[in-house]
């Protein structure tokens, strides 16, 4: 959606608030040459999910949709349990006891991605320089591409370009894959038609399904680095737990994620419980118990979604930023059951392309998530990055998680955008992050608190042991 920019453009505050108002939904077209570099095995690709009507778009950024590619995985089990002591091949089809979409009358599980960069292959023709970027809570590959990839319209939100030739994530060196996640946009989701019959998926399901995409579809035999921001960082932690012991993933760099969002993280749990409660407070949800797909879009729980976004965004940015913003401007983001004029306008526009059941499931995936006891399994080089003034995911939890991984390094930054500072982190800590990616890391780089997040940069070893893995 497009809204009139009410701010001066030369202040940080205007960048922050206008980015939210705009939703960063303006895209440019990626050149064909970028995909010409991204060679992959030839498979049949699909445009939309099979057999089911799509109630929500396949891409967050419509203008980038043409670059998204799809892959289907038959008989993948969602919502099952994973035995982490078993070999990864035992997870190929999801967790034990899970439910397949086919058993519910749907088509097979769908995953989606955008790939750029330069594949390097071994003698078998397998790609051995994979670099994966998992998506965040409400995003997808088009959003991350539109924000991080070189010469895109939303680069300013992340403080400049991050992915491209010669950049921190160098497409001359790596074959970079932006990934969607099960539950929203181009991946299988409740709004493909199953609604509340859709299986309750987990973050582990997201990672295992995307690993199938990498191995079976893109023929990637080695992931050099896995990263992502927010929920993308949460998935990055899981990539480390599940796929670094075998050596498939060599390095992980979670930026602003969490290793637990159950009761072990009271603030995070509280924050997103409020979001779910907001959805469930909508009269249309209550009248249908969330089974409303037979109704016109105007009769869906759209106000519940607006309410959810309003509750989340209160703490999405620092309170000084919010307090310094005129009330008339903030009213666009404040929820009203009976809005007048510009009240709630930001969220009224946004939720036209979103679905309440999709987000109800997305929240639910986090409520029972906790891998704190599994962090010792990580064998990858590890750099944990976190925003110190994040009001959703507390920095101390990230510090403790880093300390649980032998040899991990911990880097921090402060940002007026609070949690949203995760998108800028690779530019704010450019030297640190590029050095980690290129495996030339030292503990005296900007933002580093030392190995495992403890101590000062001056007393830490030149290269923490874990970073030599």
Task: Describe the function of each predicted region.
Residues 167-212, 265-286, 291:
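Cap/lid segment of the alpha/beta-hydrolase catalytic domain
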Residues 37-130, 445-451:
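Catalytic-loop region of hydrolases
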